Amino acid sequence: MITDASIDRIAAREAASFRAANPKSLTLAQQASTNWFQGVPFHWMLDWPSPAPLVAAHAQGAVLTTVDGRKLDDFCLGDTASMFGHSPKPLADAIAKQAGEGLSYMLPTEKGVELGEMLARMFGLPRWQVTTTASEANRAVIRWCRGITGRKKILIFNGCYHGAVDDVFVDLRPHPSGWESKMRASLIGQVHDILPTTSVIEFNDLEALESTLKRGDIACVLAEPVMTNVGMVRDAPGYLDALRRLCSETGTMLVFDETHTISSGYGGHSNAFGPKPDMMVIGKSIGGGISTAVYGFSDEIAERMAKLNASRPSGHSGIGTTLSANALAIAAMHAMVGKVITHDAYRHMLELARRLVKGIESVIETHRLPWHVVNVGARVEFVCADRPSTNGSEARAAMHPKLEAAIHLYLANRGILLAPFHNMMLLSPATQEGQVDRLVHILDAAVTEFLE
């Protein structure tokens, strides 16, 4: 049994070891606090469970090097942005070439024409638009769906995350009479009440899904085909097919945010396993770390969008930014989709994912831990609970933040970098078997110590 006392003891020791091993990172963190708010250029960088964030010097493939000269096997990979490896050569070459030719014209390019064709082939949807982030893509998709359906409401799943999109920050919370929808309490500066226009239900709850959609007032269902931001929650058998059917029957747009679930296979989860959405969003890794994203849709949806666009008064649509589809972003995606995100890359990634899952399951079995492993293709997590979650509420309850943080720091001190959010791990085309085996070996050593 792993006790709180054991967790506290090891966490304190590992924090001291971190300070001793990373003096330059700590010095730079102190220096940065003079000008950067809370010492970092972006406050999420404080989410790492270490005394201070490691300061990166450079990264290549699946190895990150810090300013202290420490090399870490990187399974975080920029929290998916570099899921296909840090600075793959085709991407680096494309960025360098474009840097000498202009970065943003607010004009289309020849590579952009080719990219549209490549996206259609890869993801199976014929029409596309580019944004600067997946958050922006999701905001755009919500606007388009509301516009073409004439409906105000959207439906999301409890525990979801679709970026910095106001409309999705609604949760189900316990109430004396059962459950109630509440705006997320952690939001900063939230003014508008989004509860009247955002419905939320539990993932895999077919009865709630059917009753909500049959009201006929939902513009779109915005969902990951597998939930990945509240831990990982797999779809129950038949649930996604029922979702597709009900959306079609009720005139509701089905939107899959595949920013994370592109880990499932070539063309994303919906192409690997179905069903096909009306619209799809892909961000982060599609640009290999360059800030860009895309959303795709069917010809029928495109016709409805065009009619809406032609019928509205002149003026800003509320969709898009000046830097959307800039030449650098187009060049980056052209290189990634054309030369990096390949069938061969997925074969390697998925094979390593199976190896990692098997290794962690062996650790769990050896130590008789009440844990389990879940994966979405090349995305893997071990969960400190005895059974897989079926919805967001169960996934939240399964989390053990203090233990997860202590394990994360233990591994980081020994050259293994996991994501700071529920210890997610990604396998890239550059990841090697030895890195996977080393992770499993060090996790086994960690568990042995925590059980003492």
What are the residue ranges of the model-derived segments?
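Conserved N-terminal phosphate-binding loop of PLP-dependent enzymes in the Aspartate aminotransferase
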Residues: M1-E452
